[in-house]
């Protein structure tokens, strides 16, 4: 996993966003993005791996995510978001305009 200040911030957001969530097997959900991030070799890949489920699972963290990520990273996160409907919310659109 690539480590930097931004990766640490992404990790903190991911931990907060997935706090108390479990996967289908009953394991803490945070293990999934951490496992993906372990395979990454760049800062950008690592940040996207850590945050890839945050937009759909924890929309309360939109602001933190958008303030942290680059335009390219946000594009990747949007592509990975399964629930595209949440991306239409006025709050999310407002954050996109700030970029």
State the predicted function of each range.
Residues 1-99:
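Active-site helical microenvironments for divalent-metal-assisted chemistry
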């Amino acid at each position: 996993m690539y480590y930097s200040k931004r990766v640490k911030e992404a990790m903190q957001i991911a931990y907060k966003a997935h706090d108390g969530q479990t996967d289908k097997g009953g394991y803490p959900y945070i293990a999934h993005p951490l496992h993906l991030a372990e395979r990454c070799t760049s800062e950008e890949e690592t940040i996207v791996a850590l945050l890839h489920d945050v937009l759909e699972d924890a929309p309360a963290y939109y602001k933190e995510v958008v303030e942290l990520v680059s335009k390219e990273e946000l594009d990747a996160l949007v592509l990975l978001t399964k629930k595209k409907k949440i991306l239409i919310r006025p709050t999310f659109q407002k954050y996109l305009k700030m970029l």
